Amino acid sequence: MTKGILGRKIGMTQVFGENGELIPVTVVEAKENVVLQKKTVEVDGYNAIQVGFEDKKAYKKDAKSNKYANKPAEGHAKKADAAPKRFIREFRNVDVDAYEVGQEVSVDTFVAGDVIDVTGVSKGKGFQGAIKRHGQSRGPMSHSSHFHRAPDSVGMASDASRVFKGQKMPGRMGGNTVTVQNLEVVQVDTENKVILVKGNVPGPKKGLVEIRTSIKKGNK
């Protein structure tokens, strides 16, 4: 069955394996995960748990900042006897009988050796050209060349008379939801509530990440 938790990417470091091998790892801090709702096949058509992460300030009348929860969010969290949460995500295909509304989801949900998928928002790179954004080749850099870092041809013959949708062109790069699959949990530190994941995960430092059981290898 699927397991999941939300956390913040702290950064990267390295640890030594049992055979002395140096392993690069990403540190993910996963605190304040609470089950806000359970969904079942009988009521909702599928099994899932709704997990909230990071407390939000209580409702405040006329508050314009999104740091404060609104009344619906506060009422929803109150059913779980929890504070309003800033981030709420759903994990499907879980063993709902193993969870209770209001229960804290801790890092020991995972153990060393688990294979996981990690989802995050990639770093934003701003407006970039086709060479950096899509990996296109540049032209000659010699003095007589008139083509250095321009995009590939996007024009069509008179038959089409238009640029096709999906043409690779300059534009905003990064800031996309990215999932890296089949990563390995190296260590779980229950005292500091952190998970060490082998390799790198999407997003900047302090970015939100979702850790869940690998969809390809997790249930084998």
Swiss-Prot record:
It comes from the Bacteria. GO terms for cellular component: cytosolic large ribosomal subunit. It holds the Pfam family Ribosomal_L3. One of its GO terms (biological process) is translation. Residues 127-155 are annotated as: Disordered. Part of the 50S ribosomal subunit. Forms a cluster with proteins L14 and L19. One of the primary rRNA binding proteins, it binds directly near the 3'-end of the 23S rRNA, where it nucleates assembly of the 50S subunit. Belongs to the universal ribosomal protein uL3 family. This is Large ribosomal subunit protein uL3. It comes from Staphylococcus aureus (strain JH9). The gene is rplC.
